[in-house]
Structure formats: C-alpha cells, structure tokens
Amino acid sequence: LFGYMEDTSVLQAFCKERNILFIEDAAQALGSSLNGVHAGTIGDCSVFSFNSNKVIAGINGGGVVLTDDDEIAKRVKQIRRHGKDKTFDTLGYNSRMYVLNARIIEQRMKHMEDNQSKRQAIAQQYNQAFADLPIVTPKVTNGLNNNYHKYVIRFEDKDTRKRVKKALNASIHYETPL
C-alpha cells in the first residue's frame, strides 16, 4: 500500500509449493523498488492501476496486467475480450483500454521518474517537519525506493487525530487496517 513494497519470498514459496499463481498487486507501487527489484516484476503476473488517484492516471482509469508467461497472457487477453477465444468458454468482460487513454498514460510515463523524485523530496521535508510531533510518519526502510503514492501519517492519540482531521479537512484513507 501507498508505494511500499515488502519481502514476499515466504509468500512466493508458499504459492510455488502449492502450484498457486502469485499475482502481484502493484496498483499503488508503480516506480517503487525494494533492493533493486521493481514493483511488478515479482509475481507470475502483476497488475497496475491507472485510476485517477494513482501515480500515473489515465483519463478514464484502466490498468495493465504484466507477465512473461504465455499461458497467463493468453488467458488475460481472452478474459478482456468477453471471454472469446475460438469459442466462448470463459466468462469475460469488455476490458480493452481506449487508444486515447493509452496514449495519455504513455506520455505521463515519460515524466514518472521526475515526478517521483519530487514526491520523494517532499516526503523528506515532511519527515523532517514532523520529526518532533506525536505522529507516526511513513517508515523509511533500507533498500526501499518508495514512490510515495500517498504520504500517510498515523496518530497514536485519537483525540489529536480528530482535531487535526477537522482543522485540515483531512480524511482517513482506509478506515480499518488491512
């Protein structure tokens, strides 16, 4: 969440032992990396979102599935075309991205590294400014290159959280921890 990546080696091994596909949800981690390994390169396939609140936004959302597995790629293509292959043996959807949306995303991708550097610099300023306050700021982990999709702070004290939320017209992104 929020651009963080975690070590998934135990989960990957669990999936591999049981012949379960490891699908990497990288919707909020585009541009992030952990120990030089980029988000979206870990799973059997990975998914990214281009919704309006993501690092790269399309004009009407959308997303992409990445894989280097030919069978997974074939199956994803079938599902996005109403389940059509030679016959309709799979439930599918009309999940094709409009060309205009794809072109806008393509152009925005060209600025991703620069925008990420700016978000990281702002996050460092926030970390310094909030250092002496009774809040929990995003953790800085060795080896993590965080895209800072969101800069999330937590309050230990609920009354302080309520006062700050009201004063700043802030919101709680996820009400209950996952």
Briefly describe each language-model feature range.
Residues 1-58, 64-66:
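Active-site phosphate-binding strand-loop segment of PLP-dependent enzymes
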Residues 4-13, 17, 33, 68-178:
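PLP-dependent aminotransferase class I/II
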